[in-house]
């Protein structure tokens, strides 16, 4: 197997078969947390945070350690990036020391520049545009509740709320890669960028999926297999909550809306959740909710992704399955 440097910067960086490989590997890690240890040594992986985090920090820190590596966790305040050092300079330095970079930051251009100057895998742990690691965990969760990864292709998923945010974008692209029927609903002014919708439709045409963007929450949820939402106000916008939340009340996931989905529909939320806002307590704490499985699967999915990317970079086929 020829070594091939691969990064995970947006959801369509994996094709259909590659996404399946990573998800199958994630399920194996769920059954055996020490299934593979590609970083035995220990070799360091730089884990950078420009934004606060609970799930991403804990899952990558624990995950790299369980893969046999050392997670070098650096906050914005503790790095020269926080003082304006060019991304390219930081990338060149980390590339001489670490065996990969995981970065939770703001602009998508920042992770893309990091990857440009790296000879090891770079993983987008969240940007303003995409959240691909979360989508892998979400799809792993569906697969585990629906009989396996092969059954993802038959799923209809619906995302409600701020349809212009990174989660909506990643559901569009990641769902298209999986061959799902993806529905995204939000109010006017909070819909996905046309270029992202176009990319999702192009991929869906290749995988047999479909894409629907609508302002009608009921249309999106009707007969869906899984319903997703996210906070209506992203990090840094909390002071504007009263103003920003007004357009979204028709998209609250409640028992009435869930009743329009299939009777066995799942509910997922990437967290943190605000009960009584984007979702009611009856739903997120109810029998259809799988949010705690979803949160745990961040660990397994990200370990699978790091292992797969490392296998590609080294030309080591044993790390791909």
From Swiss-Prot:
CC annotations in GO: cytoplasm
EC number from the UniProt entry: 2.1.3.3
Gene Ontology biological process terms in this record: arginine biosynthetic process via ornithine; arginine catabolic process to ornithine; citrulline biosynthetic process
List of residues binding carbamoyl phosphate: 53-56, 80, 104, 131-134, 270-271, 298
Predominant cellular place of this UniProt entry's protein: cytoplasm
InterPro entries, A to Z: Asp/Orn_carbamoyltranf_P-bd, Asp/Orn_carbamoylTrfase, Asp/Orn_carbamoylTrfase_sf, Asp_carbamoyltransf_Asp/Orn-bd, Orn/put_carbamltrans, OTCase_ArgI
Keywords: Arginine metabolism, Cytoplasm, Transferase
Binding site for L-ornithine: 166, 230, 234-235
Membrane-spanning intervals of the chain: none
Coiled coil, from the record: none
Listed GO MF terms: amino acid binding; ornithine carbamoyltransferase activity
Pathway annotation from the record: Amino-acid degradation; L-arginine degradation via ADI pathway; carbamoyl phosphate from L-arginine: step 2/2
UniProt catalytic activity: carbamoyl phosphate + L-ornithine = L-citrulline + phosphate + H(+)
Subcellular location as annotated: Cytoplasm
Function: Reversibly catalyzes the transfer of the carbamoyl group from carbamoyl phosphate (CP) to the N(epsilon) atom of ornithine (ORN) to produce L-citrulline.
Family: Belongs to the aspartate/ornithine carbamoyltransferase superfamily. OTCase family.
Protein name: Ornithine carbamoyltransferase
Organism: Bifidobacterium longum subsp. infantis (strain ATCC 15697 / DSM 20088 / JCM 1222 / NCTC 11817 / S12)
């Amino acid at each position: 197997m020829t070594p091939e440097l691969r990064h995970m910067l947006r959801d369509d960086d994996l094709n259909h078969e590659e996404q399946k490989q990573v998800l199958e590997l994630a399920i194996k890690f769920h059954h055996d947390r020490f299934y593979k240890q590609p970083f035995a040594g220990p070799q360091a992986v730089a884990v950078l945070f420009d934004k606060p985090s609970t799930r991403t920090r804990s899952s990558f820190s624990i995950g790299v350690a369980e893969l046999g590596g050392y997670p070098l966790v650096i906050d914005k305040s503790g790095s020269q990036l926080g003082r304006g050092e060019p991304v390219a300079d930081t990338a060149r330095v980390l590339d001489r020391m670490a065996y990969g970079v995981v970065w939770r930051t703001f602009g998508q251009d920042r992770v893309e520049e990091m990857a440009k100057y790296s000879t090891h895998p770079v993983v987008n742990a969240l940007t303003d545009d995409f959240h691909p690691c979360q989508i892998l965990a979400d799809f792993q969760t569906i697969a585990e509740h629906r009989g396996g990864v092969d059954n993802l292709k038959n799923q209809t998923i619906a995302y409600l709320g701020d349809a212009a945010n990174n989660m909506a974008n990643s559901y569009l692209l990641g769902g298209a890669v999986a061959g799902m029927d993806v529905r995204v609903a939000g109010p006017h002014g909070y819909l996905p960028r046309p270029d992202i919708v176009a990319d999702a439709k192009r991929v869906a045409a290749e995988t047999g999926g479909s894409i629907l963007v609508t302002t009608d929450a009921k249309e999106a949820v009707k007969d869906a297999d899984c319903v997703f939402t996210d906070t209506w106000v992203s990090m840094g916008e909390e002071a504007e909550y009263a103003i920003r939340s007004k357009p979204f009340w028709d998209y609250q996931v409640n028992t009435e809306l869930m009743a329009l989905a299939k009777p066995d529909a799942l509910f997922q939320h990437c967290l943190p959740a605000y009960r009584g806002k984007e979702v009611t307590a009856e739903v997120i704490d109810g029998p259809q909710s799988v949010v705690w499985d979803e949160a745990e699967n961040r660990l397994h999915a990200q370990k699978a992704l790091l292992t797969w990317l490392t296998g590609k970079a080294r030309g080591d086929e044993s790390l791909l399955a």
